[in-house]
Amino acid sequence: MRFPEFSGEWEMASLQDIAAINPKSDQLQNTFIYIDLEAVEKGELRKIQEIMREEAPSRAQRVINNNDILFQCVRPYQKNNYIHKILNTSNQQWVASTGYAQIRTTESPNYIYHLLNTDGFNRKVMVRCTGSSYPAINSEDLATIRFYYTPDKKEQFKISRLLDLIDERIATQNKIIEKLQSLIKGLAAQLTQSGTPNIRLCDCLECHSSTLLENCVSVTGSY
């Protein structure tokens, strides 16, 4: 399935053909924002921590730029990957754990990010992983994985924009679900812990069938 205005052939390439993997990093500043393996969940940055260089863990080495992609090398099936978008206009340095592969591409970063999150790419990653409890892939093996991609920048943009919009809709729906779940928990607590005397179940329910049908529910809520 493709957008109708595009017809050129897709090309086969390895990740290292279209991106720099773990590019040389600048020197760490005295303080920086650190992204560890627990900070990212399904593409979202869930935790931000500012730390001092002398207190930083040894894994804090990858200085990241805007639009750099972080690929989770440990348990990559979780797909906790992240594309970095600068959250402020200051010169604050951002540093990622070496548990991520840092990917800097000249193609559309959003397009490559979505490509790396596909099931097909993930399967190729998993067969190259070592370890059972914590399967992991090293950056050198990740760089050699081959895949088809469109070299057309306009097509890359349209594909990534569509997938971005879908992700935004999913994120919005998930937030609505979280709020409804919180509301349900609050109502349940109020209804079950309101201090009213306990009553027998048979005094408040009328059970006519083990299978609940819509027409069995009375206007009073009994069934």
Task: Label each residue range with its predicted role.
Residues 2-25, 193-223:
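Non-catalytic DNA-recognition/assembly elements of restriction-modification systems
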Residues 19, 23-55, 211-223:
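DNA target-recognition patches
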Residues 57-58, 131, 153, 164:
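Short, solvent-exposed loop/turn positions at domain surfaces
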Residues 77, 92-98, 130-154, 211:
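A short glycine-rich beta-alpha junction/loop motif
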Residues 1-13, 146-188, 196-197, 201-202:
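Amphipathic alpha-helical segments
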Residues 58-121:
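A short beta-sheet element
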Residues 9, 34, 63, 94, ...:
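Short aromatic/basic micro-patch
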